[in-house]
Amino acid sequence: MTQDDKKTPGQFSRRRFIAGSAVLGGSMMMPGFMNSVWAAGTDAPEKKEIRVGFIPLTDCSSVVMAAVKKFDEKYGIKIIPSKESSWASVRDKLVSGELDAAHVLYGLVYGLQLGVSGPQHDMAMLMSLNNNGQAITLSNQLKQAGVTDAASLKKMVDASAKGTYTFAQTFPTGTHAMWLYYWLANAGIHPFNDVRNVVVPPPQMVVNMKIGNMSGYCVGEPWNQRAIQDDIGFTAATSQEIWPDHPEKILGTTSAWVAANPNAARALTAAVLDASRWIDTSDANRTETAQVVAARAYINTPVATIQGRMLGDYENGLGKKWKDAHSMRFFNDGAVNYPYLSDGMWFLTQHKRWGLLDKDPDYLAVAKKINRIDVYKQAATAVGGINLPSGDMRSSTLMDGKVWDGSNPAEYANSFAMKR
């Protein structure tokens, strides 16, 4: 947990975990016994084979490793990872039922719930997959012109005609769009009025920058490190600089799928949660994970492109190297994975800020509908030894000093000087 989170209502408590272990299932069961009941008894998963979509990004790792390391078998299921080409493809296949669940952008699921990022569908968020590990890359052409950070970019944008520079993100309601907009706005650059912004699928970012289609982009790893290795760009900011330990990808599905497959949803969540804990247990496990997901079937990039930042070893392409205290995390003693209502609500505040929503929704009601805390708690009990927080909100301080704790989302959404 970050320093900001340590004294919040969402603080993790081992005592709370013990008291809350018998969630929504009657009496407490030992993890091994619970798993055998799920696999063979009345709580057996309704589906044995579960197709889970993913985009080639480092943060798909827990889904992939749940299958590769056979955590899925412990819970009576078989996860079939399905590599997808874009977030739009993930969206379409989720709502059509071609995918059972997916490694997906937090904001994509919330956008679907409100009919913003496609036709309205009731959605479900089963768990958070990771914190941190995204970045904003700027082109070497900008570097050669003297741009090395947000302040120097602001000067160049101000000196040019509006729309001269193009920036890419990965989906209109997604996390990368929100990090990019927040970073630009914090520098005084309006993401819609001062520059152009376009949607590009994550694996296509590097090649599009190489041929000059954009001046910058926001995406997940390894595509920021890849730009440095290919000598076409540099890291201007990491997403954890914008919001330390921010929410990012989630395990998402439709509400209808959970209703039809409650035991399978629980088993899937448990398997991915178990894999998340395994990844974060040691640098050796993280290294093994990098070696697995680098393969052609998954991310299809050199291991070195993934491994460094996965271990917290950063370079920015401008000569600076550092050990990042908030590098990508998959578990962090369970703090990563809990479906905090405030995390989902934050994305809605940014959708409102940037005109994707024309009025304030019932922020809390939407989050309670999507974030399936009940399923997560059941899965956490089955896995065993997973700390649960004492509340469903957490407090964080973002790069501009604003504190977000979910307490007054409408006021927060309308408090920004720069908006659309």
Regions found by a protein language model. Give the residues of each.
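N-terminal secretory signal peptides
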Residues: 1-12, 31, 38
